[in-house]
Amino acid sequence: GVVVESVATLRDAGQTYALYLPTSYTPSKRWPVLYCFDPLGRGAVPVKLYGEAAERFGWVVVGSNNSRNGPVAASLEAARAMFEDTAARISVDARRVYATGFSGGARQSILIDRLCRHCLAGVIAAGAGYPTTFRPSAPVTFALFGAAGTDDFNFPEMKALDAEMSRLGATHRFESFDGGHAWPPPGLAAAAVEWMELQAVRAGLRPKDEAFAARVWGRRLAEARGLEEASNSYAAYRAFESLAADFRGLRDVSEAEGRCAALGASKEVKAALRDEAEQTGRQSRLAAQLFELAERRRGEFESRAQAAADFRGIVEGLRAKAKAEADTGERRVARRTLGQVTAHFYEAAANLRRQHARPPEVVAALEVASEVAPHSPQIFYELAVAHAANSDKRRSLAALRKASELGFKDADALEKEPALEPLRGEAEYRRLVEEMRVK
């Protein structure tokens, strides 16, 4: 009934995971298990997120503290260690093994199903879908619940994946939430677990439970009707569509199918679908334009200044639109584009560093990321590390100071970072470390 944030595996004490066992847990029966993958290796974050739903439905939740964005082999080894250890110590229902992840963790969850020869009953993918190395193909053997924030730069990818799952005849559902590139909120996380329970009933992985099915059906039908009555036609259309798909074969879904068809033919829904597609196109064009300008900034000397000015102009315009109070398509496109460009250059810098690229290349990528996301403490910390590796103490200390001002407070990370060794004797470095320790 409590989250244990670090459990060391029996075979390797360096491999740890966060763990939640429901209060009703007993080794005398087999339990569904949800394996979680956070892109920063914060196993407790998703375990806490899914804890309430796990308690309600009787699931074990496990989150790796070692798996993270970066080298795939290391993350897969972390997953293997976690799988083997929990299989040895916890009574797991092998037919009901699930995985969830956010961003790169979502891609890893789907990759694991491929590598374990389809051992997963379901995947809850937040903020990203399939790995870039392969595409979905029939039959999709696991149930897929996709989620993305309306401001997430990967929102178009998740919508496209949902459509692809439909074409492949897969068991799937997609839900959006207010927010950006992040884990879903607790309510949606609970809805995903509830949906997996419903799919388990449909697939014969758990006993038929008419009371459970009736309860979920009644609540979701009322929600869909409420959306339609409130003239939220597109949300109602999506709600009736998923309701019909989820309960087909369990209940009479003719009302849901009828309302979905009627709403789908309405001007409001057609306009919403058209606007959604246009948002995707605008994001793609803007991101491509910014990538091209960023490349030109490193090109011929004569064109650098103009490219830099054009880049700044577009970014400043997007930033202004991103601050708008109203949730409009224009605001969503601005936020998604800024997020996409930031992530692109931040991840490029991380890859360059892992490949032991020349420090100036890492600095260049992070400078672009910091220009697009000037309020990110993590980016300025990474920029400080890159400047130090490039033997530039002055710029490194300036970036560290900015990171601290923005809220960076992981003094231990500074002290453990080898690239910052040349700064250890600097008075300002010591002052920044002490300030971080008291934050």
Where are the regions that the model predicts?
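A domain-start/cap signature at the N-terminus of enzymes
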Residues: 1-31, 75, 220, 272, ...
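Gly/Ser-rich "nucleophile elbow"/oxyanion-hole loop immediately N-terminal to the catalytic nucleophile
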Residues: 23-30, 72-106, 114-117
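Short beta-strand element of the alpha/beta-hydrolase
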Residues: 29-40
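Short amphipathic alpha-helix adjacent to the substrate-entry channel of hydrolases
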Residues: 45-62
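Short coil turns that delineate tetratricopeptide repeat
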Residues: 117, 248-251, 374, 408
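Short beta-strand/loop motif that positions the catalytic acidic residue
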Residues: 145-148
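Structural register within alpha-helical repeat arrays
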Residues: 223, 243, 260, 348-349, ...
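Residue at a conserved register position within TPR or TPR-like alpha-solenoid repeats
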Residues: 227, 352-353, 387
